[in-house]
């Protein structure tokens, strides 16, 4: 019992102390590095037409990304429900980065009786595809920059190559496992029999594995579906790059496509790291570091574009998220207290289409 209270106390310190402090430190560094008056001047002079266009592109990004998740789920569930659950995931991430990845399978289980492990598997596949898509697009951008004679920071090149290589290998392994589910589960069952585990626990592990692989069932689909999956991944992040480009145009910058996508890759990958609520401070800091490292400037305009982009993201995700609360019939209190929920039961089975009232 004491260990449980100690663990909960540490979680609270991390969530409400350390993570917000990271954002405060990031903002302090930005304030010391860039003239605040110049930033405010750039924001006041931002062109509304470009800002609205960026907001429209972000909306399309959310729609297309939800369509890809709808595809991963086998189109067994209404697209509108999938979109609103995705929106609630963004809302949860604003409150506590990483919470959205738990909220989405939890909501699928609640509304459509999808086993939690199977739902989580689809979310994990989503994130894997996101990192793969961004890294491969970014790597191509870096090669283009190098061919053009532009210098690319070694750390950015390393991030691009590392993430692209790692995600490609994981995708290949997942692809093979998803196409040989019975063999994988049988192999795990044989291994577990050699371990000092109770039969019930061993069977539970096999059930979880079966559910996880059920969530990756799309990797067993036809070639046209595979093309749609990977093509929609590239399309999703190219649309996101367009939204970032329009944010830059709002403050008078016109980055080259390779610079635009390369910097965006660094920003997106950084969101997998510990961050304060809403990524406030860290988003702007990584944006400035990445794009300045790629030679884009002046820094006041680069940071102003980051504030425009992030401001639109927060406004849209909060708006769509609260609309999603009404559509999915869940309260904000339930969503934000998700981490206090009892561990959901994993169940073997596919992605059922049964809806709860």
Give residue ranges: language-model regions:
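Transmembrane helix-loop-helix hairpins in multi-pass inner-membrane proteins
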Residues: 1-41, 85-197, 280-357
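Helix-boundary and loop/linker segments of multi-pass membrane transporters
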Residues: 9, 39-47, 75-79, 111-112, ...
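Alpha-helical segments in transporter systems
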Residues: 12-15, 54-58, 126, 224-236
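Hydrophobic/aromatic residues in alpha-helical transmembrane segments
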Residues: 26, 64-69, 104, 240-247, ...
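Short helix-coil transition sites and intra-membrane helix breaks within transmembrane domains
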Residues: 59-65, 71-74, 93-102, 272-285
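Membrane-embedded helical hairpins/re-entrant loop segments and their flanking transmembrane helices
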Residues: 63-87, 247-262
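Membrane-interfacial helix-loop connectors
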Residues: 77, 248-308
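Alpha-helical transmembrane segments and their immediate interhelical loop/hinge regions
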Residues: 204-257
């Amino acid at each position: 019992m004491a260990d449980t209270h100690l663990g909960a106390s540490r979680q609270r310190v991390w969530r409400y102390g350390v993570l917000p402090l990271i954002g405060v430190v990031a903002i302090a560094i930005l304030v010391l590095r860039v003239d605040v008056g110049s930033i405010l001047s750039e924001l006041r002079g931002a062109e509304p037409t470009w800002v609205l266009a960026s907001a429209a592109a972000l909306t399309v990004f959310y729609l297309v990304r939800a369509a890809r998740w709808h595809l991963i789920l086998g189109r067994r569930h209404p697209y509108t429900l999938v979109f609103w659950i995705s929106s609630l995931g963004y809302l949860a991430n604003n409150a506590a980065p990483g919470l959205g990845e738990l909220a989405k399978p939890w909501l699928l289980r609640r509304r459509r009786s999808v086993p939690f492990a199977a739902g989580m598997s689809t979310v994990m596949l989503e994130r894997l595809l996101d990192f793969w898509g961004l890294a491969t697009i970014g790597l191509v951008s870096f090669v283009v920059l190098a061919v053009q004679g532009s210098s690319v920071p070694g750390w950015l090149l390393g991030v691009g190559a590392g993430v692209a290589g790692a995600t490609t290998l994981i995708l290949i392994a997942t692809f093979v496992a998803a196409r040989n589910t019975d063999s994988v589960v049988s192999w795990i069952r044989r291994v577990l029999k050699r371990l000092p585990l109770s039969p019930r626990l061993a069977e539970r592990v096999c059930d979880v594995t079966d559910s996880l692989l059920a969530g990756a069932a799309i990797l067993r689909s036809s070639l046209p579906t595979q093309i749609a999956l990977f093509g929609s991944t590239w399309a999703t992040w190219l649309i996101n790059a367009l939204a970032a480009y329009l944010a830059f145009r709002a403050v008078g910058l016109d980055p080259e496509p390779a610079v635009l996508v390369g910097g965006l890759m660094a920003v997106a990958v950084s969101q997998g790291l510990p961050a304060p609520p809403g990524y406030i401070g860290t988003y702007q800091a990584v944006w400035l570091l990445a794009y300045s490292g790629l030679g884009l400037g002046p820094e006041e305009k680069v940071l102003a574009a980051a504030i425009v982009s992030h401001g639109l993201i927060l406004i849209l995700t909060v708006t769509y998220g609260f609309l999603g609360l009404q559509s999915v019939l869940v309260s904000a209190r339930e969503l934000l207290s998700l981490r206090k929920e009892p561990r959901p039961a994993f169940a073997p089975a596919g992605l059922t289409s049964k809806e709860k009232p």
